[in-house]
């Protein structure tokens, strides 16, 4: 869809939206842009797990999720982060709706590797009808990084992967992956642009590592699927632009 911008909010930004962020969203909406927000909630999940003296473990940048962890993750994403983000947007006159009952119907997923990651899913399909309906009504959908498989199991999904899938399914003009760092760093400097052909080598040499790996991988897939631009950074306008080449 022309004029659609998908924004993934993670890290500190997911806990409190800045005035600059709100003003940029308002400016885009005034210019006729349609916006979808996808969010994670890793910091809140970590805190809730710590309070319950439960371990946090990641493999290749993805959170290992036991079935018993799911209520905690659901509480963090739906009960805290998503609810707060939606309230902040609505309080700023940006009409928004948190997807709760519609989330499982919108995001279909399946286990990535149950033995390795537990209840962690990869997106198999995005049902766009409800999202398109909200966008047509100038409402910002707010999606937590959760989905359901064909058996109705709730699965934890990396928010970067989900945002990429949403952007690809809607054929958005832009995907923005917001994080706590300025972009992809090499020698302590932000790379203004990263070509898809350069990514494998950057991972092999350790320039791209940890939680940045799924971000970059999802960005590459999104660019190759036809989405116009993918930006990774700590704000809505600057960072590392992922481009095909």
Which residue ranges define each predicted feature?
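C-terminal catalytic "cap/lid" subdomain
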Residues: 1-245
